[in-house]
């Protein structure tokens, strides 16, 4: 016989917010003794790990000035500038990959930056007034996501904003 019971708890919707977890945690707190340990099978493919990458999720909104696409020089196309920010994310990730720590236990062994959702524009022939996109940064231990945000803000402030304001 076991001295303490073993409980199996399953949740759902890991990819878009772990919507089932909060109510599950609340129920566990109310109904059973605090667990001595937990096994989480995702995203480790059931391998034992001692650390997990950090996650920073943020929303970026770019505001431009609407113009007809045949008169782009009179507008500030928000989607095009958002694309340059997204390209910065990709270039920064490539830079990280050059210094991958293959012994880190992470796959990949470097911090990743990713844009997973983008919205903007009203028509194909209009320079968009607004573009919004969502990004996540998965940092390896020892790296601070704030450092990436500061680099990105510096790029926006010193490179993109002057170009956008010159029109």
Positions of PLM-derived features:
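Acidic/histidine-rich catalytic neighborhood of metal-dependent amide-processing enzymes
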Residues: 1-57
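Metal-dependent amide/peptide-bond hydrolase catalytic core
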Residues: 59-167
